[in-house]
């Protein structure tokens, strides 16, 4: 698993298992597996919401031109995400 935070042009921060989509040697996009949008709340709380909550898709392709940056999540955020995808809740605080 490559758990990363993907920062999108839409100003959303999405945490997911991220895979590159290739065409030859070029990255044309990313596949987000079990993506969740991160929101920041008061007192440094992070809340997880399903990305595309009206869809049953668990794998969502994103074109590379929509990605601003991909970063490594803090360990606490990564652990909360992993708990979330294990089916413990639909949205959680960290």
Name each model feature, range by range.
Residues 1-94:
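Conserved RNA-binding domains used in RNP assembly and mRNA/RNA metabolism
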């Amino acid at each position: 698993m490559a758990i990363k935070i993907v920062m999108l042009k839409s100003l959303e921060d999405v945490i997911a298992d991220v895979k590159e989509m290739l065409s030859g040697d070029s990255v044309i996009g990313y596949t987000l597996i079990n993506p969740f949008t991160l929101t920041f709340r008061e007192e440094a709380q992070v809340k997880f919401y399903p990305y595309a909550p009206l869809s049953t898709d668990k794998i969502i392709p994103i074109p590379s031109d929509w990605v601003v940056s991909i970063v490594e999540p803090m360990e606490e955020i990564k652990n909360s995400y992993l708990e979330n995808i294990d089916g413990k809740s639909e949205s959680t605080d960290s």
